[in-house]
Amino acid sequence: MKTLKLNNWPYPIEYHEDWENIINHISDVIEETGPWLLEENTSPSHENIFKQLKQSLKDKRVCIVGIDPYPTDATGVPFESPDFSKKTIKAIAENISRRYNVRLFKNYNFLFVEGVLAWNYYLSCREGETKSHKIFWERLADVFINHIAAYVSVFYFLGKSDFSNFRSILNSPTTVVVGYHPAARNRQFDTDETFEIVNTLLELKNEPRINWVQGFEI
């Protein structure tokens, strides 16, 4: 693990070497925007905003992307909810449990699913306000996504309205699936088959399927 220390950001940013190629870009942007970001009460907290940079990328096949963190109590790990109270992760867990016949579980976390990286397009929001930090991340969001694209085989974007323009995000041809947001109206996500579609796409690429059941805390 490496560490990035900045003049205008008081928290050391730990990162895996797989992110090295964009660290200078991150440094330049945060040196400029960090002071304004520090003035906000954020979700996740300032020291946890870059937590996912600790994740390796070479061992990832799929990246699941949400638009931004929970507006309260985000941990820095996308979709993570330590007390399993968040509607989004509960809907995800219920969808996967129905498909793979997991009946009893206490929580779900993509962090434990081999080959999967969970990511937020915007790494933070103002506490209580979704999509409120677009201005802080617009210079880095696509940089992150395109860097991840060099490693993974499939992107799964959660939210048809949020990611309707995904083709303008990616600079290179990448297999992309855009599904319903877990909190979508009319409970469209309940019958969404995208987790299995992702596995079918991996098989077509002669890559191992994802064992989504690994994310359950039983």
From Swiss-Prot:
GO terms for biological process: base-excision repair, AP site formation via deaminated base removal. Signal peptide: none annotated. It is an enzyme of class 3 (hydrolase). SUPFAM superfamilies: Uracil-DNA glycosylase-like. The keyword Hydrolase applies. The keyword Secreted does not apply. The active site is at 68 (proton acceptor). PROSITE patterns: U_DNA_GLYCOSYLASE. One of its GO terms (molecular function) is uracil DNA N-glycosylase activity. Its EC number is 3.2.2.27. CDD domains: UDG_F1_VAVC_D4-like (cd19372). Keywords: DNA damage, DNA repair, DNA-binding, Hydrolase. It holds the Pfam family UDG. It comes from the Viruses. It catalyses: Hydrolyzes single-stranded DNA or mismatched double-stranded DNA and polynucleotides, releasing free uracil. Homodimer. Interacts with protein A20. Component of the Uracil-DNA glycosylase(UDG)-A20-polymerase complex; A20 and UDG form a heterodimeric processivity factor that associates with E9 to form the processive polymerase holoenzyme. Excises uracil residues from the DNA which can arise as a result of misincorporation of dUMP residues by DNA polymerase or due to deamination of cytosine. Also part of a heterodimeric processivity factor which potentiates the DNA polymerase activity. Binds to DNA. Belongs to the uracil-DNA glycosylase (UDG) superfamily. UNG family. This is Uracil-DNA glycosylase. It comes from Fowlpox virus (strain NVSL).
